[in-house]
Amino acid sequence: MNPSPYLYGMSIQLAIAQFSPKKGDYRFNLGRLGDLFAQIDALEPRPQLLCLPESALTGYFLEGGVREVAVTAGTLARDLHELYRASVTSPRMLDVVLGFYEEWQNKLYNSAIYVTLGGSEPIVRHVHRKMFLPTYGMFDEERFVERGREVRAFDTPWGRAALLVCEDAWHSITGAIVALDGAQLIVLVAAPPARGPWP
């Protein structure tokens, strides 16, 4: 794993995990993430930022099942924190970005969270709610979740960052807004459907 230089001369150890979740099974997929935390703990140099896909702990195509698997950002952060502490031998700080179905203010969203683990409590640095929901072809996301209403940069240990979820990145306005807000790093989570003859 090579350092990814950015932030004007700083570098960060970044890990990107391809993660194919068991559809609709938050607890099972959380357990698999614990195995991933243990693998990361054994790496040297150890990653400082772990990125997982959109809807990493439930799968993407849930349609009406979103309500059953949606969690609050606080619940997800606590679950990740407890799992991380139980899965590693030395709980050094680890920043994690992953997509999840979020329940917020009695509405459901396709969201991404940036959370710092390893301290006495998890630190939720930002939650981004997907703004551009696809409603074409095989996609009908707007029937099951609400649109997010803002996109902005936020502070991390590495500088200003921003989160986008899948189709948000197809619209140049989102990148322009976060760049104007000082983002030096944009983390995009996505779960495009598989294509081709592979299982």
Show the residue positions of the predicted features.
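Beta-strand initiation motifs
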Residues: 12, 24, 121-124
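Active-site catalytic loop in hydrolytic enzyme cores
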Residues: 73-78, 104-185, 189-199
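Cys-nucleophile CN-hydrolase/nitrilase-fold catalytic domain and related Cys-dependent amidase chemistry
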Residues: 34-121, 126-127, 193-199
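Residue-level signal for inorganic ion chemistry
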Residues: 14, 29, 51-54, 187
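Short loop/turn motifs at secondary-structure junctions
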Residues: 13, 45-46, 92, 160, ...
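N-terminal phosphate-binding loop and adjacent alpha-helix
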Residues: 18-36
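Extreme N-terminal starter segment of soluble prokaryotic enzymes
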Residues: 10-16
